[in-house]
Amino acid sequence: MQVLPLYVMSTFKMGPMGIGLCFIPLFTPSFFSTLIGSAVDQYGSRKITLLAFLIDVPYFLLLQLVTENTTHDKILLYILLFFAGLAAALKTVALMVEVNHVVEEKEKECPGIFGEQGGTAQAYGLYNVAWSGGQVLGPLVAGWLVEWKGWATMVSVFGIVSGGMAIVLAVTSKDVVRLGMQG
């Protein structure tokens, strides 16, 4: 959503305060991270991550409909930004848990592989590097897409990529692989 401030400014003729208010629905879901954590504990990190990418697809595609300086489009934008924030919060919590699970699994397979202190800090460091790379690459790609073909193309591409990630998560899930072997 790195191009969001510029899009909101040009579409809705908003100033800094109006643009800042757009971030309220985007970040509100992060206050429910403890509930999301409970859901991850109950259903598993991969299922919650899959759900997050599935939520990404419609909200990205529906952002194409936000095109005019009308109350309807502003309300639609705020609703879609809430779902964008929800998907982001789901992914953040679930992926952090997944990092921990991978480290624990590797340490069980090969005790001491990460040294005396374990590999959790190193794994979170790598997670942070990957996340930061996305935070750099995402705005560059989004900006390029908006300049090249416009807002609708940018949100469509991000929706398609999210759909692709959902497919990858679904087909690589242990539950799906087991069903394929049984069938």
Residues covered by each model-derived region:
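Short amphipathic helix-loop junctions that connect adjacent transmembrane helices
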Residues: 2-17, 104-105
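Intracellular juxtamembrane helix-capping segments at the cytosolic ends
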Residues: 4, 90-114
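Short hydrophobic/small-residue motifs within alpha-helical transmembrane segments
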Residues: 26-28, 132-133
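Helix-to-loop junctions at the C-terminal end of transmembrane segments
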Residues: 32-45, 146
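Cytoplasmic membrane-interface "Motif A"-like loop-to-helix N-cap segments
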Residues: 42-56
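C-terminal ends and interior cores of transmembrane alpha-helices
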Residues: 54-71
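Hydrophobic core of transmembrane alpha-helices in multi-pass small-molecule transporters
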Residues: 74-91
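A membrane-interface helix-boundary motif in multi-pass transporters
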Residues: 141-162
